[in-house]
Amino acid sequence: MENKKSHYFYVLLCQDGSFYGGYTTEPERRLTEHNSGTGAKYTRLAKRRPVIMIHTEKFETRSEATKAEAAFKKLTRKQKEQYLKTFH
């Protein structure tokens, strides 16, 4: 039986009020990495931590998840807020 990995696009709310969008196969592990300062360069800055994972979307393929991440990163702040409201 094949054990398929799930792929996630996620959004963090940083301590400074900014959003960070990323990709992972393990959201809990990735959140721990971001909060410990070993995650993405963006979240390594102390002023951005701690971070809270405020959104996750599950995809079947890495390609779908990274496309969602790329699309989110192109949005303006206002558009990101609107996008997140559609899910919550």
Curated annotation (Swiss-Prot):
PROSITE patterns: GIY_YIG (PS50164). Residues 5-82 form the GIY-YIG domain. It comes from the Bacteria. CDD domains: GIY-YIG_UPF0213. Belongs to the UPF0213 family. PANTHER family: UPF0213 PROTEIN YHBQ (PTHR34477:SF1). This is UPF0213 protein EF_2693.
